[in-house]
Amino acid sequence: MMTSNILSRFLPPNGSPSVYETLRQQDAESNPSDVEERAGLEFEDDRRTQFSDRELEEAMVDAARDGIRSPSPSPSEPFLTQRSPQRTSGTATAKTGGRRRKHSRPRWMHQDPDDGDDDVPPSLLVEGHQDDDEMRSRLPPPPPSHRHPQRELSPAPGPSSRADRARWNTTREQLPLHNDGRGQRPGVIWSLGHPNLASVDPKEKAMWLWANVENLDNFLKDVYTYFLGNGIWSILLNRGLSLLTFAFVVGFSTFLTNCIDYRNFRGSRKMDDILIQQCTKKMSMSSTFLLWLLTVFWIGKAFQYLMDIRRLKHMHDFYYYLLGISDSEIQTISWQEVVSRLMTLRDANPATAGAVSARHRKFMGSQSKQRMDAHDIANRLMRKENYLIALVNKDILDLTLPIPFLRNRQLFSQTLEWNINLCIMDYVFNDQGQVRTLFLKDTHRKALSEGLRRRFIFAGIMNIFVAPFIVVYFLMHYFFRYFNEYKKNPAQIGSRQYTPLAEWKFREFNELWHLFERRVNMSYPFASRYVDQFPKDKTVQVAGFVAFVSGALASVLALVSIIDPELFLGFEITHDRTVLFYLGVFGSVWAFARGLVPEETNVFDPEFALLEVIDFTHYFPNHWKGRLHSDEVRKEFAVLYQMKIVIFLEEILSMIFTPFILWFSLPKCSDRLIDFFREFTVHVDGMGYLCSFAVFDFKKGTNVISQGGTGRRESGRQDLRADYFSTKDGKMLASYYGFLDNYGGNRPANPSSRRQFHPPPAFPTLGSPSAIEMGNIGERLERTQTRHGPAATFMGQQSGLGPGFGAAGFGDHASPAPSILLDPHHQPTASDFRTANRSALYPRFRSSRPVRPITDPIEDDNESPSAEIRRGAVKKSPHTTTGSSGGAIGTSDSNLGESWRMNLIGDELDKDTGEDGENVDEIAGNAGVLGLIQQFQKVSKDNRGRTTVGI
């Protein structure tokens, strides 16, 4: 009875199909190249459509009368089919017994007799038929293994009788519809009259590979990985050294554990006295099995790297010939420049693959590569990472330890992150990197949740078998890597770094890894300074005493050893412990204790140091407001910024506790995980399914708020809905600002836009602690820590809170400057920056300019509907003039789906002016200065309305 209960948790109920069978069936039926079909816009009834015998005969008669000849199969079709087997409809239907789907228009679109006019005639295409023939002549014929007899012999897939096949063969003999080249020897003809692909010009070959890219997500990932690896030679060197490192760790560990007799170590004078002869033959069975297992893994990894050299060579040619970036330049070029050249290549070379069918060419040209600006590239590269960022931000993952005395402690390590990607991401996403449409329907919610729960349990079981080997390897690798550093500088034992959970909390949507790493690395000096500043008087006193005693003993021993080194270094202070041993002990103790004592010249200002940390991390929870100086905030930050040795110990212990988290904690949130992917996934034309927060759609969740009394009466319910559909602590708005900081400014460098030198901050005197309490730190920040980032051209002068947190809306520019790295539908508009006083995030910050104080945290539109309901309307700041770009973030109606809808600055200004009771038309009626300003504003509004669209 107990066995049946245990098995029932892993096996599906009787009579119900497995959720994996449903997922595989849906993946097989879906067309990965048709993004619109994956959005659920395809007819289900049309999938069962099949050509009848009468329709086939009529088609043959029409073809004979019109003299139509179907083009021969493209030489590249087997190549494309080999890379993506699911695209071959004939193969899929042969396995499933289904019939070919007839792609039709969705139900909500009527049939238009002029639809055929939308297609570009073949004569006007860039490649034309001559280019097709030239491309076919240069490509090798398909190998026999890649031919599809069903495609050649049958006009339509599906079961066919002998009579139908005989009639079809007779028709083919009478009407040569296909030049299949039967009876010829294409291999011999090719080898005699055509060169092979190896002799093709590398630039033309790179262009052909670029034009025939199927999966743009995977291609852009290869481009980005190649950029991070600094070229083909650096990547090959890194892989070779990683293989050598792995072999050295395994070999040296085997030598230390099996080839040395530690019982003879004492008293031995030679290496031969402690070595075990032919130690590999005397190894235990478990050690031998582990060594063979690691050897097979090493050989497989080396073979994988060798096979990947061809792909790296293709990527090298793509960078060198199409982007104009050499291996020496790739180490210094910025990613923004790479994106700019990708967009230039996109515009100069449209997706016109001559060896691709018309339907596939239309897909690639109109959807795939035309949606490839900085925003689209970031969304493709971080399609999965954006979901994980949102999961961590909304606290959906239950990472608590199921241990009685550690239930309130979260554990998130690299091992657990790998298991989450395996259990969740590989479950939700298919092989093409798209979200499975089954997760977007609530009809399979229970089955998907049970399947996810079983995946967690199965992964926990597998971790039990894998954990011992991983623990041993990481222990040896960490020891070999860091022991020498700790020996040279013992103070490094107390060095700190951010935990893996902190990195996912700090990372923003659409922020690539190298940009995030640069931003976080700049915060380390300020984070260490902040942690070391807090009062630890007792610890400092004890550490000072220990440093004094150990330093005195070490100095005396060192002085005596200098006087007579030959005699004194061999002198035993205790039994078998010489002076050299105690010199090392006392020196290490002194270095460690001295590292705990702060410098006497340091000025105590924890609030200033933490603001500098927030400047780069962009992490500022709501409960930190007004408490930056408190010890509670320090403890919470210390959990995110721990010592390296503690992080390593947690990583080792996580291999023991990870199975328990997978068994008990994560299965509890399986329902919420399924609901999250269903409710926070949006479809973007040409891109597929994306996380709703990554598209920066600020109007999601707020359009349902009705205006007037209804919205006020239901404000409580709307607040709950807005909280559910919004990020915490203004994550999406901070990501939006950070993205514009990275990809925004394009104006040429001039003396006014260059980074200016600022003197060191003027710290308050020790005799005036009230200056800190009164908020003078904000004035110092504004005066000394102003930064000019890439987006300073459209954000104005940023505050000392760093990239993404400047005071937008109070600069000299009335509207943000467009970016060459963003397409028109992603360009920032002035309505996106209306009174976006980002410096008002921090209540202790005060600008030198008169601004309206705001004590609320960063909030986007969908994160503050209750405040909008309470106010009833957005009121104009008393310090904002009519010509400024003031307003609330997201007041524009424009978003990614409706980029043509927007509210210009003038509309909001007219509305605000009406609220203030001033009749601008009446004032500007005379032909005076105000009248000219009013006319100028209207002209500017009309011009922006024609050229700028909202994100």
Curated annotation (Swiss-Prot):
Residues exposed to the Cytoplasmic side: 1-239, 310-455, 477-542, 599-644, 666-951
PANTHER family to which the protein is assigned, alphabetical: APG9 AUTOPHAGY 9, AUTOPHAGY-RELATED PROTEIN 9
Catalytic activity: a 1,2-diacyl-sn-glycero-3-phosphocholine(in) = a 1,2-diacyl-sn-glycero-3-phosphocholine(out); a 1,2-diacyl-sn-glycero-3-phospho-L-serine(in) = a 1,2-diacyl-sn-glycero-3-phospho-L-serine(out); a 1,2-diacyl-sn-glycero-3-phosphoethanolamine(in) = a 1,2-diacyl-sn-glycero-3-phosphoethanolamine(out); a 1,2-diacyl-sn-glycero-3-phospho-(1D-myo-inositol-3-phosphate)(in) = a 1,2-diacyl-sn-glycero-3-phospho-(1D-myo-inositol-3-phosphate)(out)
Oligomeric form and interacting partners: Homotrimer; forms a homotrimer with a central pore that forms a path between the two membrane leaflets.
Family as reported in the entry's similarity comment: Belongs to the ATG9 family.
Gene Ontology terms: biological process: mitophagy; piecemeal microautophagy of the nucleus; protein localization to phagophore assembly site; reticulophagy
Pfam families: ATG9
TM annotation in the entry: 240-260, 289-309, 543-563, 578-598
Protein's job: Phospholipid scramblase involved in autophagy and cytoplasm to vacuole transport (Cvt) vesicle formation. Cycles between the preautophagosomal structure/phagophore assembly site (PAS) and the cytoplasmic vesicle pool and supplies membrane for the growing autophagosome. Lipid scramblase activity plays a key role in preautophagosomal structure/phagophore assembly by distributing the phospholipids that arrive through atg2 from the cytoplasmic to the luminal leaflet of the bilayer, thereby driving autophagosomal membrane expansion. Required for mitophagy.
GO cellular component, one term: phagophore
Keywords recorded for this protein, A-Z: Autophagy, Cytoplasmic vesicle, Endoplasmic reticulum, Golgi apparatus, Lipid transport, Membrane, Phosphoprotein, Transmembrane, Transmembrane helix, Transport
Polar residues compositional bias, start-end: 16-33, 79-94
Biased composition, class Basic and acidic residues, residue ranges: 35-54
Annotated segments matching region Disordered: 1-165, 848-897
GO molecular function: phospholipid scramblase activity
The name this protein goes by in its record: Autophagy-related protein 9
Composition bias, Basic residues: 97-108
Main location (coarse class): membrane
Domain of life the protein comes from: Eukaryota
Post-translational modification: Phosphorylated by atg1. Atg1 phosphorylation is required for preautophagosome elongation.
Intramembrane segments: 456-476, 645-665
Membrane topology classification: Multi-pass membrane protein
Protein's organism: Aspergillus oryzae (strain ATCC 42149 / RIB 40) (Yellow koji mold)
